[in-house]
């Protein structure tokens, strides 16, 4: 498994917001987990609210601990994603209907686009969002 770190920034909010990708199989699929880092500690997960970043920061590291434990290949990253992000993704359908964007929506659009094998970037995401308006 290849673990790579990338960074992008919004200096008004967080300074630099690194993201970690876990390449599950070479050339097959990449899953992006955006984390907010302060030094070597994770202080925010994708499901965290901005107001929560100043309190209970130690809880954020549990997500990485859950994903890193275990020495045999298994479905721990899938379980971690379901546990930490599942409720947020399904809960964000209401926000998607209201045309609001959030990190979970982006992750779901990337996953849907990747699993369908189509290309086209944001256009596919807009079509996907329209499908849920009537649903």
Curated annotation (Swiss-Prot):
Superkingdom of origin organism: Eukaryota
Protein family per UniProt: Belongs to the UPF0329 family.
Protein name: UPF0329 protein ECU07_1860/ECU10_0040/ECU11_2100
UniProt organism field: Encephalitozoon cuniculi (strain GB-M1)
């Amino acid at each position: 498994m290849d673990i790579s770190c990338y960074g992008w920034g919004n200096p008004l909010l967080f300074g630099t917001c690194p993201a970690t990708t876990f390449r599950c199989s070479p050339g097959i699929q990449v899953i992006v987990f955006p984390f907010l880092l302060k030094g070597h500690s994770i202080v925010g997960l994708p499901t965290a609210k901005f107001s929560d970043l100043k309190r209970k920061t130690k809880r954020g590291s549990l997500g990485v601990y859950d994903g890193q434990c275990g020495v045999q290949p298994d479905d721990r990253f899938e379980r971690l994603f379901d546990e930490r992000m599942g409720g947020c993704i399904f809960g964000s359908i209401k926000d998607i209907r209201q045309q609001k964007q959030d990190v979970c929506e982006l992750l779901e659009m990337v996953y849907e686009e990747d699993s369908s094998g189509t290309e086209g970037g944001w256009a596919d995401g807009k079509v996907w969002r329209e499908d849920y308006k009537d649903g």
